[in-house]
């Protein structure tokens, strides 16, 4: 779950876009920061102490690690910087002096759907391997196929649409990240079986 948290800032970007507010400095800042990670771990640690339940502490550590791994992966894979120490500034961009081809940068948007599809495929493989979440298999398969279909549909669209692509893509991206987040929660038995 923690690896989804940093990109939930896209909901704020969407709101700002719809409200005609500036979107600069929203994505890959606060939710990608090590201070956000530390705050997440601390909040869940305090809840765990208050409730006297180590599961809350473990959840906070898991969310924090997932969040941190996401931010580090963004720095390695995307060609945009990450404000790892927000609000102190100092965007880190390993690729600052490299200009990737335009076709590749465009491809990165529909590739998000491909990666959601692969993630859901892995969950399904684990569910079959560990014989878990059988009652959710059909719905899971449907969500996975939707993600692969979105990838197939949006790959040519990113190259041929001159206006409106990011609005449609953004709405479906928010739908996809929400779906992946909820499917992950729904299939927690599968994830727990894979971790054992």
Each PLM stretch: what is its role?
Residues 1-196:
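N-terminal membrane-targeting hydrophobic helices
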């Amino acid at each position: 779950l923690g690896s989804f948290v940093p990109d939930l800032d896209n909901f704020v970007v969407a709101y700002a876009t719809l409200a005609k507010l500036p979107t600069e400095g929203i994505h890959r800042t606060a939710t990608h920061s090590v201070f956000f990670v530390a705050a997440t771990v601390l909040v869940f640690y305090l809840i765990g102490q208050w409730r006297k339940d180590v599961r809350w502490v473990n959840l906070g550590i898991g969310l924090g690690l997932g969040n941190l791994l996401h931010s580090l992966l963004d720095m390695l894979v995307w060609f945009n910087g990450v404000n790892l120490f927000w609000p102190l500034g100092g965007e880190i961009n390993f690729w600052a002096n490299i200009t990737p081809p335009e076709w590749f940068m465009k491809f990165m948007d529909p590739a998000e759907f491909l990666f959601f599809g692969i993630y859901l495929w892995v969950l399904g493989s684990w569910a079959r391997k560990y014989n878990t979440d059988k009652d959710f298999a059909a719905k899971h398969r449907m969500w996975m196929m939707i993600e692969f279909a979105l990838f197939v549909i949006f790959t040519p669209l990113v190259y041929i649409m001159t206006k409106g692509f990011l609005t449609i893509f953004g709405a479906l991206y928010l739908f996809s990240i929400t779906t992946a987040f909820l499917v992950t929660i729904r299939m927690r038995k599968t994830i727990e079986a894979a971790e054992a």
